[in-house]
Structure formats: structure tokens, C-alpha cells
């Protein structure tokens, strides 16, 4: 039986088993390099499965696939959260990527010319580490939330699943990003709904048509691949702003 306190040595540790971590794993395996992916979830794709019931990707499935394996189904369809989760699980299985689930990394440190990764009683030593963890995993709740009347139901998007969790009456959605807008549209079908957040701008044409989606996706892809990259000053500036 393995000693959980024994230091395990491996060439490369990848922290995070989502899209980024699995993609890195695919490239490492393709080159025959030894590695191990550590993921805090009990099952690959659980970060998606835990989101609200109606969640869909807002990019077509043709752009949701990872290297070496297309996303199944129609290329212009918008996958559900569970379809995305199952795809990631199938991806790891197909390429036999070494993923160790249920391992939450607590600390990453440098000792000499190596890195030490600590996860509870487990310790791993690696020549290099790829940090592929997702941002925004911890809910952020405004400080004034505790001062609101206790009769007001408060839910963070992290805990929201469907409108059945809400009591009758109006709903205020705080935050006008993708999650806030998506939830507000769903809630508004059965409740008076308001949104509070920064001005997000407006696309100057209707995006629900096939032609609009065709050009919009390609425009976003062009900016993502050629403009907003670390090779361009504007990309580096935006990256610094997001990280800080």
C-alpha cells in the first residue's frame, strides 16, 4: 500500500484537469514526456456539472473541442454543461491521460532546482509545473449582503441551479457578465427581474441569425488569435489587468 506521506517524483505536474490541463496533457503525451495531472474534482468535468441546470456554452461546439478530438454533434450547436463535462471525461479516457482526481493542491514551492507540490498529506516533486487551474472558483459576495433583510433569498451563481430555488416576487441579479445575463434571462420568464452591473456595451446587430453568428464567431476568433495575445501590447495590457 502506498505511503501517502512519501514524496512522489515526476518530470511534469499539471495542476488542473479542465480544458487547459487536459490540452497540456495531450501535448505532453504526444511527445512521450512523463507527467501527472492533479485535479481537485472527484470526476473529470465536475466543474461543469455543478453549474446551473440550463447552462450552455455561448460558443458553437466546433470551437469547443480540444486538440486531437472534435466535439461531437452539430458544429453550429451550443453544448450543454453536461455535454461539455462528458466530452472532457471522454477526452481524458481516449488519450489515456494520467489524471489523479480528488487531489486539491494546497501549496506550490520551489526547493533548489525542483518544485514541490503539496496536497494534504501528498507531496509531489517535479522538474516543471504547469498551473492550469480555472479563475473565479471562489464565490465573491459583496460585504453589504449580510446587512440585507433575512427574508430576502440570496443566491450566488455558484449555488444557483434553477428558478425553483427562488421565492415569489421580484429578482435582482447583481452582475451583468455572461453568468448574470444568462441567469437573468431564465429568471425573467417567471419573475419581475432587474440587473445591476457595469455597462457591457451592445452588439450593433441581431446575433440570433445564422449569418450573424457565422461572422461574429470568426471575428472573436480573429481577435483572440491575432490581436489579444501576449505577443501584442494590447494583449499583454489586458492580461495584466485581468490578473491584477
PLM features per residue range, with description:
Residues 77-137:
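Feature captures the FAD/FMN-dependent oxidoreductase FAD-binding
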Residues 13-15, 26-53, 190-205:
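Glycine-rich FAD pyrophosphate-binding loop
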Residues 74, 80-83, 133-193:
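Glycine-rich dinucleotide-binding loop and its adjacent helix/turn
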Residues 42-70, 204-218:
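Conserved N-terminal glycine-rich FAD pyrophosphate-binding loop of Rossmann-like flavoproteins
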Residues 62-89, 94, 229-244:
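Conserved N-terminal/central alpha/beta ligand/cofactor-binding core
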Residues 180-244:
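Dinucleotide-binding/catalytic capping subdomain of oxidoreductase cores
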Residues 9-11, 102, 168:
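Phosphate-coordination loops involved in phosphoryl transfer and adenosine-cofactor binding
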Residues 5-37, 173, 179-188:
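N-terminal Rossmann-like FAD-binding beta1-loop-alpha1 element of flavoenzymes
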Amino acid at each position: 500500500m502506498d505511503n501517502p506521506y512519501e514524496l512522489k517524483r515526476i518530470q511534469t505536474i499539471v495542476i488542473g484537469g479542465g480544458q487547459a490541463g487536459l490540452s497540456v496533457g495531450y501535448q505532453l503525451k504526444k511527445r512521450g514526456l512523463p507527467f501527472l495531472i492533479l485535479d481537485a474534482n472527484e470526476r473529470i468535468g465536475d466543474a461543469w456539472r455543478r453549474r446551473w441546470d440550463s447552462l450552455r456554452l455561448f460558443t458553437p461546439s466546433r470551437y469547443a473541442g480540444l486538440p486531437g478530438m472534435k466535439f461531437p454533434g452539430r458544429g453550429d450547436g451550443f453544448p450543454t454543461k453536461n455535454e461539455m463535462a462528458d466530452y472532457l471525461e471522454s477526452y481524458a479516457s481516449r488519450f489515456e491521460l494520467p489524471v489523479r482526481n480528488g487531489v486539491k493542491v494546497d501549496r506550490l514551492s520551489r526547493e533548489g532546482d525542483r518544485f514541490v507540490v503539496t496536497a494534504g498529506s501528498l507531496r509531489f516533486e517535479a522538474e516543471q509545473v504547469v498551473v492550469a487551474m480555472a479563475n473565479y472558483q471562489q464565490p465573491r459576495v459583496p460585504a453589504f449582503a449580510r446587512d440585507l433583510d433575512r427574508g430576502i433569498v440570496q443566491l450566488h451563481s455558484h449555488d444557483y441551479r434553477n428558478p425553483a430555488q427562488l421565492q415569489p416576487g421580484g429578482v435582482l441579479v447583481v452582475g451583468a457578465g455572461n453568468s448574470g445575463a444568462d441567469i437573468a434571462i431564465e429568471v425573467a420568464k417567471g419573475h419581475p427581474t432587474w440587473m445591476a452591473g457595469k455597462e457591457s456595451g451592445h452588439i450593433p446587430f441581431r446575433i440570433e441569425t445564422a449569418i450573424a453568428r457565422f461572422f461574429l464567431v470568426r471575428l472573436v476568433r480573429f481577435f483572440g488569435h491575432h490581436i489579444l495575445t501576449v505577443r501584442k501590447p494590447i494583449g499583454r495590457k489586458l492580461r495584466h489587468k485581468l490578473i491584477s
